[in-house]
């Protein structure tokens, strides 16, 4: 399965959740599959989807146990193996902050798909073992879970999902919004 099909599969479960998507082709593919105001399409900042997702999750997490629309939304981050390897410090920060509304999904194709499919070191590293070593309690291989059930359950911790995919980019169109339009539409919807 390639990333396009993986994103399509996951987006069938997404209703009101906020989605932050990695740069380049992943964002283009998400845009083609299911464009909506609650999708934040990253443009030009490789490695930072997990950090942006963490910031949103911390802002929306329930701090005092109350649940309302403004602070209990789940944040789903679509990231890539190359981006996670560029910013591995974000994994330690996510673990230590542990927002209980963050789901980080790493599409691992073993390459930098948006820059020409150069190999990443993820081919030699077990990312699930890395996050377990950091201390994540809820980390899964996508093939071993029912994502719909994961999404429905009340989280006790941040969740890490490793999604092994084949290299390849869909022939998805360029996003026809400027960065300012993406930001403004997103913020208007989530605030």
Task: Outline where the language-model segments fall.
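Short, flexible loop segments at boundaries between secondary-structure elements
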Residues: 185-191
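A short, well-structured juxtamembrane/interface segment
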Residues: 1-12, 25
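Acidic-glycine-rich active-site phosphate/pyrophosphate-binding loop
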Residues: 17-36, 62
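Thiamine diphosphate
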Residues: 3-8, 32-64, 69-185
